[in-house]
Amino acid sequence: MEVLGLFRLEVSGPMVTVALSVVFLALLKWYSTSAFSRLEKLGIRHPKPSPFIGNLAFFRQGFWESHMELRKQYGPLSGYYLGRLMFIVISEPDMIEQVLVEKFSNFTNRMATGLEPKPVADSVLFLRDKRWEEVRSVLTVAFSPEKLSEMTPLISRACDVLLAHLERHAQSGEAFDIQRTYCCYTTDVVASVAFGTEVNSQEAPEHPFVEHCRRFFASSIPKPLLVLLLSFPSIMVPLARILPNKNRDELNGFFNKLIRNVIALRDQQAAEERRRDFLQMVQDVRHSAATVGVEKFDIVRQVFSATKCPANPPRRHSPRPLSKPLSVDEVVGQAFIFLIAGYEIVTNTLSFATYLLATNPECQEKLLEEVDCFSKEHLAPEYCSLQEGLPYLDMVIKETLRMYPPAFRFTRVAAQDCEVLGQRIPAGAVLETAVGALHYDPEHWPNPENFNPERFTAEAQQRRRPYTYLPFGAGPRSCLGVRLGLLELKLTLLHILRKFRFEACPETQVPLQLESKSALGPKNGVYIRIVSR
């Protein structure tokens, strides 16, 4: 105050308030854009970000369309900001190979928001570093073809219920939204295979499991809260974790209790009495010493055997034994991920495949001929016969996943500073693979808008450039459930096409409008007619 007195200044309360307000506003203005110079420093092109929210408005139509626009405007390497978080988007095969395979040790972890609730955070999707490797190792054993073959009868039983519902639609002759029917079906499969519970969600929509699944997928973050989370993550994320959330807590509590009760019941049963489902497969390996090394984690490459091995395959690792058995929370977490993937991804892929077959009758006729020939030799299909005896069905599913990959974006986080093909990548950077932009690149896929299963003949796959087809990711952290997902898709379409054919009708939306808030799916359902054969 004495110093101020030399200049004959009097400091009043309002003046201090104004001064502090000016300082606060200046700091707020600086904060609103301070994170938005990083991409430019890296030499990565990107849309102009807005204060606080970054490029959030750029994605108002969904990530699918925006990824396509990023590729069109900025090429196979671009970036964007969601709030203060920087994303580097890649859709160039050589760079994808470096990130997912060659430099995997530096890009082991997926991005986590910090908002994942406890059961989901304990899943193999979000576990990190050493614990991820341990859990992935034992789960890779659990997802072996031998184990999956034991689950085929459970899926077939759910198919029988589905066929009964489709028969009613065939008799009516009216158009209907088959996506809604598939939603009920996949709910039944998830309940049976992952949660050890038999439901018929079409006939009993009020069943607690069905109702909680519906609430689980209907829940979302309100837009105002999303803006705050993105703009002030260091404050809002910890706050959101501790604030009460009745809906979240009720959902987590229901599924947690359900699985724990099933586990307790199974522990009292003799081994031969236990139901052979996904939950039991995970239970079997909880204390298992049977593990595999990281080089065995890439199940996707094993399934799509035509994919070439990398020039420099990952060095062999000794299997990492479990430092501690899988906790019950981790078992619950795996069932949660099965719910997310088994419901949304399988439902949408079945819907897209149905749409493509209905609007491409010549392809459907070819597939029906194959189904009829297969059915003469295999009345009750088994896992191995499904993999080997239906090559055209396999091609149809692969082309469906090229055109409409449900999991069309996935992330990896750089653990340390590095260079990828000359591009500097700082530690902590999130790299996002734009699968849709890759799958619609005419350099790799001529006439990409056309449905053409012949792209996936054995000869065509051998000629294709590696890392241009990524519906399930690639590398050691690729989709663990790819075998189970393909099994469900093949078995379901086989059962349906034995009895019915799909037909487009005036209500069929051509082309389909898409939504891509999380997984890629039809925006307005898939309306078709189904006809008995």
UniProtKB/Swiss-Prot annotation:
Stored InterPro entries: Cyt_P450, Cyt_P450_CS, Cyt_P450_E_grp-I, Cyt_P450_sf, Cytochrome_P450_3A
GO molecular function per UniProt: 12-hydroxyheptadecatrienoic acid synthase activity; heme binding; hydroperoxy icosatetraenoate dehydratase activity; iron ion binding; monooxygenase activity; oxidoreductase activity, acting on paired donors, with incorporation or reduction of molecular oxygen; thromboxane-A synthase activity
Segments on the Lumenal face: 32-75, 245-335
Keywords: Endoplasmic reticulum, Fatty acid biosynthesis, Fatty acid metabolism, Heme, Iron, Isomerase, Lipid biosynthesis, Lipid metabolism, Lyase, Membrane, Metal-binding, Monooxygenase, Oxidoreductase, Prostaglandin biosynthesis, Prostaglandin metabolism, Transmembrane, Transmembrane helix
Membrane-crossing residue ranges in chain numbering: 11-31, 76-96, 224-244, 336-356
One Pfam family linked to the record: p450
Function: Catalyzes the conversion of prostaglandin H2 (PGH2) to thromboxane A2 (TXA2), a potent inducer of blood vessel constriction and platelet aggregation. Also cleaves PGH2 to 12-hydroxy-heptadecatrienoicacid (12-HHT) and malondialdehyde, which is known to act as a mediator of DNA damage. 12-HHT and malondialdehyde are formed stoichiometrically in the same amounts as TXA2. Additionally, displays dehydratase activity, toward (15S)-hydroperoxy-(5Z,8Z,11Z,13E)-eicosatetraenoate (15(S)-HPETE) producing 15-KETE and 15-HETE.
Protein name per its UniProtKB record: Thromboxane-A synthase
